[in-house]
Amino acid sequence: MLDVVAYRDNQKADITQEAPLTILVYAFLIGVIAGLRALMAPTIVAWGAGLGWFSLAGTSFSFMSSPITRYILSFLAFGELVNDKLPKTPSRTVPPQFITRVVTGAFSVAVLGAARNALLGGLVAGAIGAVVGTLGGASVRGALAKMAGKDMPIALLEDVVAILGALFIVSRV
């Protein structure tokens, strides 16, 4: 079984004492972010690790805190933000994009270490959050774009929500 260790203030945290509901809520919300922008969740998680918000030392995910990982993910996330605005970009609900969002949501939750010995619950919550974020995000964006008469301002607003939401969630874990 994968053992993910979390650190807070350079001391090993006993994350088994954290309320399971809180862990599942964070996992779900990270999934929602991945549903909005597939690469935003892992990118912000990598930056959180790199900035020392939590430590991945001694885990299978320690590579996520390296500068090269952060820069590559940032470059790819920026590309996703640009590509999302192009008229020929397929809907996020087509199978390849949908599956990617579920996988990146679950992966991001795994990196954060949803809970020791409760990783499966966190992964499931993250995957469900990604489904909700994908379908809900597409629905809300479509409705708001229809009301506004333009998609671009709503797409940019969605970018801001994804970036700030990910920063908020990851900084709290």
Please tell me what each predicted stretch does:
Residues D14-V25, G48-I68, S108-L123, F168-V173:
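Helix-coil boundary and interhelical linker segments in multi-pass alpha-helical membrane proteins
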Residues A46-W47, L51-S55, M64-N83, P96-R101:
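Alpha-helical transmembrane segments and their juxtamembrane interface "caps"
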Residues F78-S91, L135-M147:
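C-terminal ends of transmembrane helices
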Residues E80, T100-V109, E158-I163:
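Core segments of transmembrane alpha-helices
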Residues R92-V103, A125, D151-L156:
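Cytoplasmic-side transmembrane-helix entry/capping segments in multi-pass membrane proteins
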Residues A106-A114, G126-S139:
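Mid-bilayer segments of alpha-helical transmembrane spans in multi-pass integral membrane proteins
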Residues G142-E158:
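Interfacial loop-to-transmembrane junctions
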Residues L156-R172:
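Final/C-terminal transmembrane alpha-helix of multipass membrane proteins
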